[in-house]
């Protein structure tokens, strides 16, 4: 089954903006090649996580092997990788692209080129891919194929006159896509007589088989029963099973150069699988490793704590299994006075954070609290030391800090020009600096530099709401710059609550401090004594709210008679409340934490 000559193999990925029809096109290609029977076919076959179907987005890159009898009489093997379109999963995209030689660029014929399309295309061009433009949704009344072709040529700079016009939903001209793949994409190169070199593209955990690894063979042959070695750490395994996805797992005897498939080698420890590693034969190892992927750098950090403290070990196991499946996610243990034991986790963006949280609660049945997301600051001390700050609660006193640098991004925003004004206002409110503004037809492309801290909380939601959902947004990290940043501590009854501390620009500190105090005032239940909720920068209080005391009517039992009796009781109550205020502990309910952290910043 795997003795296909190299000239008849095509490895390709599908890249596009969110909702431009990647996964639907993948369904049609699978159907056209007869890989699944009509009964097994469902919409978005490759989106096999329940979460992916629910949200209608692709999170994990998936792979499938198809055989296609072309018009030239030969039968080709097509290895398809469906990639995510979201900027938060760009790491998944870069891995898929490294395993392929060409890409189908899918563009919605009614919407045109969007910000994510650009980001993913540039990644494909960097990977030296042959790119075949495909216009999807040409059956829609609003479709303008000619305008979009001109836009592809103008914005991306690749010829689009021979773009394939299709409708993935109705199956129109799917044959044209398959023919374009066969005729326009280059075959892989490789030599099966050389020592084995295979790229580890992905890995995940199967409850029955243990760790399963997805590989792309570059040189040599990978056989069932052979001994393999991981080149990064020298770990050696015995291969139990080799196979391909069609899209079900189909075992085969061996995989040759240019092929994509999976191996199962009884790998017990999750840590031994580093995505981007090179796998070679233990007896005849390759001389050098393949160029892997650049490791992903987490951009957003937040604390995850189990609501039930007994779940800590379960959370640790769950995180290590998720890390195997999603190499772009990092975690380390930490403790908090308010929330107990938990983990500080690093993500590529807010959607990534949300998805990991959802997966932990669905796949591992964990109830978690997440602290407010923060970015990584660089802190320079007066004694000359530099450290990275992941947690706002760890920020030292201002007297020992010389300067703080925060990360900036370059954001590309595509928006119809009717909504441009609102988008520019939003960017300048968030301390943005305009770098470029160009028009492509009726759409504007704005390039801004923005502090990541301002984008992390709700920038994406606000952008969608001011542009009625039409704006699309993509960003790249763009270094660190010094800024006037302060740590705001939240104190409840004079006690600092470390989980609610955050870092903000001095200009926004007061308004954010005030809004979080007002929110907590609504959420913390009243006690028998007054509770002060304060936001402070160092020792200076910048906002305060007071929760009034519950009053118990101690004089109810007195009737008429002398005032001194009542006064005595009231004085006694006053003394008691004073003592309570001194020693009373305020329990902040779980719901108050969640609501304060979710707050629209």
UniProtKB/Swiss-Prot annotation:
Pfam short name (any one): GTP_EFTU
Any one GO CC term of this protein is: plasma membrane
EC nos = 3.6.5.n1
Xref: InterPro entries: EF-4, EFG_III/V, EFG_V-like, EFTu-like_2, G_TR_CS, LepA_C_sf, LepA_CTD, LepA_IV
Enzyme class, UniProt record, top EC level? hydrolase
Q: Which UniProt keywords apply?
A: Cell inner membrane, Cell membrane, GTP-binding, Hydrolase, Membrane, Nucleotide-binding, Protein biosynthesis
Matching entries from CDD domains are given as: EF4_II, EF4_III, LepA, lepA_C
Where is this protein found? Cell inner membrane
Q: How does this protein lie in the membrane? A: Peripheral membrane protein
Matching PROSITE patterns: G_TR_1, G_TR_2
GO terms in the biological process aspect are: positive regulation of translation
Question: What does the UniProt function comment say about this protein?
Answer: Required for accurate and efficient protein synthesis under certain stress conditions. May act as a fidelity factor of the translation reaction, by catalyzing a one-codon backward translocation of tRNAs on improperly translocated ribosomes. Back-translocation proceeds from a post-translocation (POST) complex to a pre-translocation (PRE) complex, thus giving elongation factor G a second chance to translocate the tRNAs correctly. Binds to ribosomes in a GTP-dependent manner.
Protein name (Swiss-Prot/TrEMBL): Elongation factor 4
Species in which this protein is naturally found: Gluconacetobacter diazotrophicus (strain ATCC 49037 / DSM 5601 / CCUG 37298 / CIP 103539 / LMG 7603 / PAl5)
From the UniProt record, report the name of the gene that encodes this protein: lepA
């Amino acid at each position: 089954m795997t003795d296909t000559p190299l000239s008849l193999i095509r490895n390709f990925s599908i890249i596009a903006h969110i909702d431009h029809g990647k996964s639907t096109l993948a369904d049609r290609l699978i159907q056209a090649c007869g890989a699944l029977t009509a009964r097994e076919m469902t919409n978005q076959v490759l989106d096999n996580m329940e979460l992916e179907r629910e949200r209608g987005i692709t999170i994990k890159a998936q792979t499938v092997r198809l055989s296609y009898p072309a018009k030239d009489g030969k039968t080709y093997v097509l290895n398809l990788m469906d990639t995510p379109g979201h900027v938060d999963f760009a790491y998944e995209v870069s891995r898929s692209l490294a395993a392929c030689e060409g890409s189908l660029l899918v563009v919605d014929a009614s919407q045109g080129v969007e910000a994510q399309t650009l980001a993913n295309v540039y990644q494909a061009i960097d990977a030296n891919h042959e790119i075949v433009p495909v216009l999807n949704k040409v059956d829609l009344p609003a479709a303008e194929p000619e305008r979009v072709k001109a836009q592809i040529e103008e914005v991306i700079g690749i010829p689009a006159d021979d773009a394939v016009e299709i409708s993935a939903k109705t199956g129109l001209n799917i044959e044209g896509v398959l023919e374009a793949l066969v005729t326009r994409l280059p075959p892989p190169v490789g030599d099966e007589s050389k020592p084995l070199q295979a790229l580890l593209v992905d890995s995940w955990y199967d409850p029955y088989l243990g760790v399963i690894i997805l590989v792309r063979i570059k040189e040599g042959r990978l056989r069932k029963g052979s001994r393999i070695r991981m080149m990064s750490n020298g770990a050696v395994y015995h291969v139990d099973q080799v196979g391909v996805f069609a899209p079900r797992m189909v075992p085969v005897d061996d995989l040759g150069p240019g092929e994509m498939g999976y191996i199962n080698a009884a790998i017990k420890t999750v840590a031994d699988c580093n995505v981007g590693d090179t796998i070679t034969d233990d007896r005849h190892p390759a001389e050098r490793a393949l160029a892997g992927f650049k490791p992903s750098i987490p951009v957003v950090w937040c604390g995850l704590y189990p609501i039930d403290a007994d779940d800590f070990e379960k959370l640790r196991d769950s995180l290590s299994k998720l890390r195997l499946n999603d190499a772009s996610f990092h975690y380390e243990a930490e403790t908090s006075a308010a929330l107990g034991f938990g983990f500080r986790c690093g993500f590529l963006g807010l959607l990534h954070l949300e998805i990991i949280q959802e997966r932990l609660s669905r796949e591992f049945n964990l109830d978690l609290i997440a602290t407010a997301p923060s970015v990584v600051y660089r802190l320079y001390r007066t004694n000359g030391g530099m450290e990275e700050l992941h947690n706002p609660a760890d920020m030292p006193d201002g007297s020992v800090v010389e300067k703080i640098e925060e990360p900036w991004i370059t954001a590309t925003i595509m928006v119809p020009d009717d909504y441009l004004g609102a988008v520019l206002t939003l960017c300048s409110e968030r301390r943005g600096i305009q770098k470029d503004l160009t028009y492509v037809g009726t759409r504007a492309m704005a390039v801004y530099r923005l502090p990541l801290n301002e984008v992390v909380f709700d920038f994406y939601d606000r952008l969608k709401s001011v542009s009625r959902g039409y704006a699309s947004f993509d960003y790249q990290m763009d270094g660190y710059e010094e800024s006037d940043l302060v740590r705001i501590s939240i104190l409840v009854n004079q006690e600092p609550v470390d989980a609610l501390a955050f870092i903000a620009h001095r200009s926004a500190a007061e308004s954010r401090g005030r809004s979080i105090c007002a929110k907590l005032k609504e959420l913390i239940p009243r006690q028998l004594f007054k509770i002060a909720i304060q936001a402070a920068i160092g020792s200076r209080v910048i906002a305060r709210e007071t929760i009034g005391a519950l009053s118990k009517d101690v004089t109810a039992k007195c009737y008429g008679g002398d005032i001194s009796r009542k006064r005595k009781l009231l004085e006694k109550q006053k003394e008691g409340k004073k003592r309570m205020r001194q020693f009373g502990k305020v329990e902040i309910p779980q719901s108050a934490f969640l609501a304060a952290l979710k707050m629209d910043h």
